[in-house]
């Protein structure tokens, strides 16, 4: 009645990149723009008109404000740019957890950045994230040069009390030539 088609897919073994790619494959190929959000994320009002204003015909991906953490008055504590608005056919999701978009297009990748769009994150603090450790280990097994997930794996070992593994992994993170983001480097030290 409202033009919505609901599809169901069970993903075993669970991986976030596989789930997102299956979801992406359900989107018609002639779709211009994909907007990927999670159930615990909410765009501020006016996001769609801002997207239509900012997006250009040759744009492949858009970075926008992401409030990962908010205080009790809904003011940002941790804010950064996130890039989960993208052209339909130019990307695939990679990494079993802390998944990211990887460009697979055949033309030049054109990324834009805007402050006109904001996505707020309202995490369910009761939700278990126990699968993250094994998924991060798998991610590093698949790509031992991925500095981002190497950092996250070291951090996850620390959260679980595996301090020697955490130290070894965070030292590996710091030794990667691609590990240049100052915030993650500082946290790994």
What are the functions of these language-model segments?
Residues 18-24, 42-168:
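Catalytic-site signature of metal-activated, phosphate-bearing donor transferases
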Residues 7, 35, 62:
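Conserved Rossmann-like nucleotide-binding pocket used by diverse enzymes
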Residues 1-13:
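Acidic donor-binding segment of Leloir-type glycosyltransferases
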Residues 151, 188-189:
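TPR/TPR-like alpha-solenoid signature
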Residues 139-144, 174-188:
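Flexible helix-coil transition and linker loops at the boundaries of alpha-helical arrays
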Residues 25-44:
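Short beta-strand-to-loop acidic/aromatic patch adjacent to the donor-nucleotide binding site
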């Amino acid at each position: 009645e409202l033009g919505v088609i609901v599809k169901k897919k069970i993903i075993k073994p669970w991986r976030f990149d596989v789930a997102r790619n299956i979801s992406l494959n359900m989107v018609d190929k002639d779709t211009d723009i994909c907007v990927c959000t999670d159930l615990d994320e909410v765009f501020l009002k006016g996001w769609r008109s801002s997207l239509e204003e900012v997006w250009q015909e040759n744009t492949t991906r858009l970075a926008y404000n992401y409030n990962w953490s908010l205080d009790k008055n809904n003011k940002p504590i941790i804010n950064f740019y996130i890039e989960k608005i993208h052209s339909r056919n130019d990307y695939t999701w990679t990494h079993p957890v802390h998944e990211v978009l990887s460009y697979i297009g055949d033309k030049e990748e054109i990324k834009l950045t805007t402050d006109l769009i904001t996505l707020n994150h309202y995490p369910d603090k009761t939700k278990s994230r126990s699968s993250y450790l094994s998924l991060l280990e798998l991610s590093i097994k698949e790509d031992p040069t991925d500095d981002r997930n190497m950092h996250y794996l070291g951090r996850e070992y620390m959260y679980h009390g595996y301090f020697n593994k955490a130290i070894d992994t965070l030292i590996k993170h710091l030794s990667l030539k691609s590990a240049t983001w100052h915030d993650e480097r500082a946290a790994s030290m």
